[in-house]
Amino acid sequence: MTGARALTLAALLLMAPAPVHADRARDLADLGDRTSVEARQRGARALGQSGTMGDLLALVRALHETDPAVRAFSETSMWEIWSRSGDAEVDRLFAVGVEQMTAREAEAAVETFSRIIRRRPDFAEGWNKRATIYYLLGEYERSLADCHEVVKRNPYHFGALSGYGMIFMRLGEPETALGYFERALAINPNLQQVEETAQVLRRLLIQKRKGTI
């Protein structure tokens, strides 16, 4: 997410009324309401609290909406759903790990997310956060291995698919990188930086095939 998109989303969150309580069935109905964009915005936002992994397909569809607020809320809600394990201790550790990442305490964060993975190997976001840290440490093979685990558990994880692309760029495999970026964009076409990188790679590969570079 770019800085501009983050500011836009923050403004939308401030303007939109917060849901009083989580009602998944109601929120899904709102998201699917083709007669009211306000209802779809409300549903897209509220599913961040009430939604489950089973609601991801509905949110993926909403990522392709014409209304920018619906798209932004849907993306945020997907991340919120992904970040809930259903295990209070894992969720506590997850918050600790995110704080460690923010503080750039890489080794401590790796250990925290490794603890999460050992306790709840089915929790895809534990693998994703560790993959991110490994990437930042330059441990690309380990990061790739964790990305495999993420996508195996959550095939809609556009963040992990984008991560694959970033890793393969570092490994000097632009064609493979582009393939993963395009897979991420097929799920979430709102990833501006990913789209810009994909455009650069397409031009690079065209020039390479023509023998001009």
Positions of PLM-derived features:
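Amphipathic alpha-helical scaffolding segments comprising HEAT/armadillo-like alpha-solenoid repeats
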Residues: 21-32, 52-62, 87-94
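Helix-start (N-cap) detector for alpha-helical repeat units in TPR-like alpha-solenoids
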Residues: 37, 90, 124-125, 158-159, ...
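Register position in tetratricopeptide repeats
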Residues: 49, 80-84, 102, 136, ...
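Terminal, low-structured helical/coil segments at or just beyond the last alpha-helical repeat
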Residues: 99, 178-213
